[in-house]
């Protein structure tokens, strides 16, 4: 009985997050309506507020739901392969996620667009996406037996920053036709810079 009610609560939270994502993407953060989110989720407004205290809580939950640094940065997988292979696996996972996940791209666009008016939301994104990835990659770069870098934190930022830039140009700004760059060529060149 308890697991059934727990599953219903999980399903309801998922429905709310799905409704919130649709509303935020359609209207932006400022114009998003809690009434429309509740309607899209098929829940009452009091139920919506019992799960998430408000619009900011909903947005934060969406960011946390979409953050998957653990999947991209699997420590055991990273440390058991030669450094070139480890970085390549990570880069391919990251870029595939970046290019293949339309909700993530939409959320990224929204955060960039709203960051001037809502810096707290942008900081929530940095805290939940960038910070964990950079911290974990810095640690892994320092631990990898095949790599000796002077500053693992700087190296992690260069690596992740290069991939984010590639994703922004190719996917968010639709630059494939203007600045074409084969993904594998980009990844191999980036890794050579780091490991040499």
Outline where the language-model segments fall:
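Amphipathic alpha-helical packing segments from all-alpha helical-bundle domains
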Residues: 119-146, 188
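Hydrophobic/aromatic residues within well-ordered alpha-helical segments
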Residues: 12, 55, 66, 87-90, ...
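Hydrophobic/aromatic-rich alpha-helical bundle segments in the mid-to-C-terminal region
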Residues: 142-191
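Amphipathic alpha-helical linker/stalk segments
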Residues: 60-93, 139
């Amino acid at each position: 009985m308890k697991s059934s009610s727990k599953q219903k609560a999980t399903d309801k939270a998922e429905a709310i997050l799905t409704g919130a994502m649709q509303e935020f993407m359609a209207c932006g953060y400022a114009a998003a309506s809690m009434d429309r989110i509740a309607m899209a989720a098929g829940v009452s407004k009091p139920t919506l507020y019992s799960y998430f205290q408000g619009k900011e809580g909903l947005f934060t939950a969406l960011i946390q739901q979409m953050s998957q640094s653990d999947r991209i940065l699997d420590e055991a997988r990273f440390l058991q392969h030669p450094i070139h292979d480890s970085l390549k696996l990570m880069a391919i996972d990251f870029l595939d996620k970046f290019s293949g996940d339309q909700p993530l791209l939409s959320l990224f666009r929204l955060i960039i667009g709203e960051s001037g008016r809502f810096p707290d939301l942008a900081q929530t994104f940095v805290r939940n996406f960038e910070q964990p990835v950079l911290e974990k990659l810095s640690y892994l770069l320092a631990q990898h037996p095949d790599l000796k870098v002077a500053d693992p934190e700087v190296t992690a930022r260069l690596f992740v920053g290069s991939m984010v830039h590639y994703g922004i140009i190719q996917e968010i700004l639709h630059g494939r036709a203007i600045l074409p760059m084969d993904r594998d060529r980009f990844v191999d060149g980036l890794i050579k810079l780091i490991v040499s």
